[in-house]
Amino acid sequence: MSSTDGSSGGITRRGFLKGVTAAGALGLGLSGMTSTSGWLREASAEETVEERVAYTYHQAHCGGMCPLKCTVRDGRLVMVQPNDACAMDRLKTICLKGISEVQHIYGDGRIQAPLKRVGDRGTNQFEQVSWEEALDDIASHIKQAQDTYGKNSVVVTTSSETDCVFLQAMLGAQGRGNTGIDIGYGNGLDPSMGLGGGYAMSTPEARDWVNSKLVLTVGSNFCESTLPQVRLFFEAKEAGAKMITVDPHYSTTASKSDEWIPIEPGTDAALYFGMIVHIVEQGLIDQDFMKQHTSYPFLVDVATGKLIREHEPQMVVDEEGNEAPEDGQADPFYVIDEATGAVVPYQQTTNPSLSGTVEFRGATVRTVYDLLLDSLANYSVDWASEITGIPAEKIKELAELYAEGPSSLALGWGGNDKIANADVAGHAAAVLVALTGNVGKPGTGVGVYVGGTYNCHTAALGEWALPEDMVAAENEMASYDMRTKESNAHVLIAGDDLCQHYGNMNVSTAWANSLDFIVSIDPYFTEGCKWADYVLPCTTRFENDEEYGNIKNGYNQILLQEKIIDPLFEAKTELWIQRELAKRLGFENALPATSRERVDAILSTSEDEAINTLTVDQIAENQGVWPIEGAEECRRVLEDYAFVTDSGRMEVYYDSLVDYGQALPAWEAPVEITSDNPLRETYPLQLSNVRTRFQIHNQFQNAEWIKQYYRPTIEVNPQELTSRGLQTGDAVRVFNDRGEFKVYVNGNESIRPGCARMYELAMGDFTIEGNMQSVTNDTMLERGYSLMCGPVTPFSDTLVQIEKA
């Protein structure tokens, strides 16, 4: 065996290859794979070239799932194009990341052989081993841990980019649980409508924007992070929608909008409070919508803060065997009948009163709307202006435009979503929508519109069924809490870059070092691989050992993953890896014997007859795409106002949060980036993590073609450079009490003074030194544990200082 010692297991941008030994360790003997020198050669007129075309899909994490047409010449991928068999031109999507796969999948970021750690964790010392040795040892460690500590001593974390879908249940392992990522706004918004799953994925398609008079974008950068569907933004603009973007920085989307409104980071909720106050004061509310379709008329016990219901909610078992509280039909809420003044179940009147205080069952009860009016006494438009930095007249103008409607409120997974008070902003947005009725009608909606596949038409696909006794363990806690709280986690199998998923990397690496055993499964060497005991190379979407690999929902169509090329290097498919582990653990027969068997099951086990009668061969004959019924029309939500809540209405009063003073949203400042924080004297810059066209989270940082145009850089307003004696291009140290890293700095007028901006998840192999997560905030609010998806990780609720390195 040969060993490697480098900053990325032999595969970094700094040219890890330090000799024949190192190259051999990672299987880098393929000519031309580690540099561009072997890419081009003279063509011969007599040469016979074998060329074919096959079809697959691209990444899911951006929400694009672009259907791709791939040209293969002499066994090598040479061209990637949009799939021209898509039913509509708007579905034929691709971006520079998809095009770059021609180089990327052959790049030096690939893990080319199984690697075994030979040094301390994090020191990046590995040796190449055989698949047999790696899998035997991994299976042995799993058995040993489960025999000693129980099945749930194994924790399996995966992502949509690694297809290890059977592993958690197969092993009876824990999963990752709540993620703390992309759930800030949704935690506050989604309970009001019963949609979105905590991720604010509660919107119609962005195609619906053509019906809007106003598209108000807050904390989202649609034109940067949703490249495959960016035409929808311009179609709406051309149709007459007023496009307004609220963002601390002059973002790509702001630059394409009709108007940009700068805002102080972390103050979205204050903006909504200001708009709400003005809408109420000016009588711009939609009373009919409020009475018929919201919880504003519901009565609340003034003493307890609890909603009045017929009886204490009982737990019932649904058709799938899951326990849930009784809904509003079985245990109704109460309102005041405006005609009679009587307190009645909400279903028994079509004209409930929005205001009123009465005695009922020995308690003083008031309407939710009256309680809202009381809470608004704490706010004013001038107060909102002072907090947000937005002129009071602009807040009033924005409120009037929004109330006039039809308006779409486009939120995002950047901006305030990554700040500790994000749920308050989401809740305040729900209150704003419920006052104006800007939901359920053409041109209206609220939530995250980025990523076309997140809110489009989907097919009810099935999946290969594991034996009934093969089920995942219940999660003890979210994995971010495993870092600091006692758990039974001993073995971690990561199909994702787990080190990048948490703030404050020092805590993450300390946890990693405390675990008995870590396995990383990935096509590319990531930051998390450096702490693994074994690193296993899996294939990309372009490689397979069989004709077909998987079937997934794409953007309004079903997509088939065909084999484009053979697995590169020693990479194996995720199904092969899972089957080999299952074989060693005694349950190989539980998994599909072939990929074809699995993809057949994905269709045949669907409960939708249109899907279970469809065949893989039919999709393949249509170049790997199949239109979803109804996709020619824009997908909308809640058109009948049938909210998926206990009452069937839009519920804006959360009595589960009474103890935190947030039954109705109440202003709460960020935990670190407030202007009056004494830490500002030492660390004066708010560090914002934002998304970029150049990457999908941590992916594509090692894509050579893209790296020609971007390197990890911290951007600040030029006045921040001047005050520190810095110039664009200088290497700087970015630091706070948590840690530090070094990158280049760039002066950019579009960045708000007092702020710094970086594209998210800059890994240590691509910075000058260190990892971006070394400085980010990991404070979890106690209230967060009572929210739908647990507390948000406040990556952007972070203060730093920069100085010349």
Tell me what each language-model feature is:
Residues 2-288, 292-353, 364, 382-383, ...:
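N-terminal export/assembly segments and adjacent metallocofactor-ligating motifs
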Residues 2-3, 165-234, 239-245, 270, ...:
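Extended redox/cofactor-interaction regions of prokaryotic respiratory oxidoreductases
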Residues 153-160, 384-390, 413-420, 452-453, ...:
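Conserved short loop/turn motifs at secondary-structure junctions
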Residues 113, 117-133, 284-392, 564-651, ...:
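N-terminal leader/propeptide and maturation segments of large enzyme subunits in energy/redox metabolism
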Residues 206, 542-567, 577, 582-587:
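Glycine/threonine-rich phosphate-binding loop and adjacent beta-strand/alpha-helix elements that clamp
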Residues 27, 284-289, 395, 409-410, ...:
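Acidic/polar loop patches that form or flank catalytic/metal-binding clefts of enzymes
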Residues 215-218, 256-257, 364-365, 379-382, ...:
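Flexible glycine/proline-enriched surface loops and loop-helix/loop-strand junctions
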Residues 419, 574-619, 698-700, 704-715, ...:
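Long, contiguous, secondary-structure-rich segments that constitute the structural scaffold
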